[in-house]
Amino acid sequence: MGSNAPPPPTPHVVLVPFPGQGHVAPLMQLARLLHARGARVTFVYTQYNYRRLLRAKGEAAVRPPATSSARFRIEVIDDGLSLSVPQNDVGGLVDSLRKNCLHPFRALLRRLGQEVEGQDAPPVTCVVGDVVMTFAAAAAREAGIPEVQFFTASACGLLGYLHYGELVERGLVPFRDASLLADDDYLDTPLEWVPGMSHMRLRDMPTFCRTTDPDDVMVSATLQQMESAAGSKALILNTLYELEKDVVDALAAFFPPIYTVGPLAEVIASSDSASAGLAAMDISIWQEDTRCLSWLDGKPAGSVVYVNFGSMAVMTAAQAREFALGLASCGSPFLWVKRPDVVEGEEVLLPEALLDEVARGRGLVVPWCPQAAVLKHAAVGLFVSHCGWNSLLEATAAGQPVLAWPCHGEQTTNCRQLCEVWGNGAQLPREVESGAVARLVREMMVGDLGKEKRAKAAEWKAAAEAAARKGGASWRNVERVVNDLLLVGGKQ
């Protein structure tokens, strides 16, 4: 006799990214996987990010494709932020989010629950919050909704943040006085006690700990984030286990079950069950200049230096000039992604030497580009990067060596691992000088240093491909996360 039990309700997963492109992208990738497996997905923007997208791209950027709208919706919650707040003011963003978002997110969860009554709409079965968005976990726990958390940066960055408390206990943070912020001896303090990263120095820890304020917003927020993540049902990391094995193993002693699913974009590319409709969702406030791809088509294999410092990093006019002069004299063709707001407070005029290279067809400067496609283009032979995690994952998947110029946050931690552990990159001096830029670019493009780094980059590319393909380690973890965790309400 057949069972008369009703079918299980459709899973309804709410995803809450931090309002930054590097955070939104992996959560949207996860949304694609969930949507393709039949889940209803609610993707939550804060007003700040939503308004920035509207201003830059129009309503089409935040409207789900018609083919996906039945089970995919965008919701927006207030965050107390003005559009005048620069996106690189991470402390200001984080402080406003944690002060202002809990109440509106609570209200959203209540409303989503009330919509179920009398309608064919499933209740919320799981909340996936960015680790930075601690209010999402708090509201879910209050409502009795299972929740898991997604850390969108590197595992080594997470381990660095996890040890902020230890830095405070050992008297290293806050810095005793402002002079220590630039004291090389102090910044070189060894941190052999960090498990899985015994080669770390104080300067390699995520930079938000560099403060003299005992009540610093970013330090206190980080401590709160780590406590919240430790209490979650599970933790998703967009990393390659083989790349960060020692670090992930060290994290396992502090956090709930960890699922390494990276590079998530590559897992999606090898998956036959990622929502194609949601691939059209635009998450960038910058318009991609695709003419760079045809420009690359005309360059020899491995000849082009690709330069991009991400969606948030900024530099001074003097630093931009030194980079420009270094690229102009490096001897290789270059593609430089120079955002309109990459220079702090002023528009910088590019030097004649660089403009001459552009006029001769040996250089191209664009405001934004389809980075994953650029990195995989046969003409590209080097990536000059800020060491943001999404950029490094894309470089790993493309097998590109990296010349690093880390700017803030865990980029310094990523850089140390890149140079000392993974072996597929080298570092530029923090004080940018055109001669050093040109010299290091040449060494990476045609010297023995570059040969060594390219060989290691090729090894990591193969490892990433193996993990992401069907049956690989990251592919299997994605299947576990989606099918065994998120689609059944975060139960284990």
UniProtKB/Swiss-Prot annotation:
| Gene Ontology biological-process annotations | dhurrin biosynthetic process
Stored Pfam families: UDPGT
Keyword Transport found: no
A GO CC annotation given for this chain: endoplasmic reticulum membrane
Biochemical pathway: Secondary metabolite biosynthesis; dhurrin biosynthesis; dhurrin from L-tyrosine: step 3/3
**Where found?**
Cytoplasm; Endoplasmic reticulum membrane
How does activity shift as pH rises or falls?
Optimum pH is 8.2-8.5.
Briefly, what is this protein's role?
A: Glucosyltransferase involved in the last step of the biosynthesis of the cyanogenic glucoside dhurrin. Catalyzes the glucosylation of p-hydroxymandelonitrile, producing dhurrin. The enzyme is stereospecific for the (S) enantiomer of p-hydroxymandelonitrile. Prevents the dissociation of p-hydroxymandelonitrile and consequent release of toxic hydrogen cyanide. In vitro, is also able to use mandelonitrile, and to a lesser extent, benzyl alcohol and geraniol, as acceptor substrates, but not hydroquinone(1,4-benzenediol), alpha-terpinol, linalool or farnesol.
Query: What name goes with this protein?
Result: UDP-glucose:p-hydroxymandelonitrile O-glucosyltransferase
